[in-house]
Curated annotation (Swiss-Prot):
Principal subcellular localization: cytoplasm
Name of the featured protein: Protein-L-isoaspartate O-methyltransferase
Native organism taxonomy: Bacteria, Pseudomonadati, Pseudomonadota, Gammaproteobacteria, Aeromonadales
SUPFAM superfamilies in alphabetical order: S-adenosyl-L-methionine-dependent methyltransferases
Assigned EC number: 2.1.1.77
Function description: Catalyzes the methyl esterification of L-isoaspartyl residues in peptides and proteins that result from spontaneous decomposition of normal L-aspartyl and L-asparaginyl residues. It plays a role in the repair and/or degradation of damaged proteins.
One Pfam family this sequence matches: PCMT
Protein's gene: pcm
Gene Ontology CC terms: cytoplasm
Annotated family: Belongs to the methyltransferase superfamily. L-isoaspartyl/D-aspartyl protein methyltransferase family.
Keyword Methyltransferase attributed: yes
């Protein structure tokens, strides 16, 4: 079974949260890639989705999701909808996902896929991810799916008390970071080296 093979690989890579594994099993990744790539959809690898963007490797989706949901967040902000795959995984795990995408055509396609899967606990908008979604915050958790050159202040400002921000940071050398808010204090942990497309300031029609 192709899905089980991927789950076994994720378990071997130390993904332990059964909720994350169950969500990944439920989301048909082939719907989120080009038809020509559908045969690779359940491979544990990143794939191109056009516009210089990618659908992240399932391991990285699982790893970031596992970090994000440790405190059982209800309202989550995702920066970089992309194909909508990570959005769909989150939608199986939290009460509501707010997601922002700077490339309008990607955002349109992602919305269509999420509707097709009857995932109605998602609010999506076209906009500049560096700015977050201030009038919907604060958020219990924020996930960024592209590498910011530095941690965006607008995002830490939109993090609720006890909230978590998971994001890749850096230019040529990138690291996955976990930032947690306790009152007015922010603590940051560097977790592992990663490779993501850059988080670009601005939006595109």
């Amino acid at each position: 079974m192709i899905v089980q093979r991927l789950l076994n690989q994720l378990i071997a890579q130390d993904i332990r949260d059964f909720r994350v594994l169950a969500a990944i099993a439920k989301v048909p990744r082939q719907l989120f890639v080009d038809e020509a790539m559908a045969h690779k959809a359940w491979d544990n690898t990143a794939l191109p989705i056009g516009h210089g963007q990618t659908i992240s490797q399932p391991y990285m989706v699982a790893r970031m999701t596992e970090l994000l949901i440790q405190n059982d967040p209800a309202h989550v902000l995702e920066i970089g909808t992309g194909s909508g795959y990570q959005t769909a995984v989150l939608a199986h795990l939290v009460e509501h996902v707010y997601t922002v995408e700077r490339i309008k055509s990607l955002q349109f396609q992602a919305r269509r896929r999420l509707r097709q899967l009857d995932l109605h606990n998602v609010s999506a908008k076209h906009g500049n991810g560096w700015l977050g979604w201030p009038n919907k915050g604060p958020f219990d958790a924020i996930l960024v799916t592209a590498a910011a050159s530095e941690v965006p202040t607008a995002l830490t400002d939109q993090l609720a008390d006890g909230g978590r921000l998971v994001l890749p940071v850096g230019d040529s050398q990138q690291t996955l970071q976990l930032i947690e808010r306790s009152g007015s204090q922010l603590t940051s942990r560097i977790l592992e080296p990663v490779r993501f497309v850059p988080l670009i300031d601005g939006d595109v029609e």
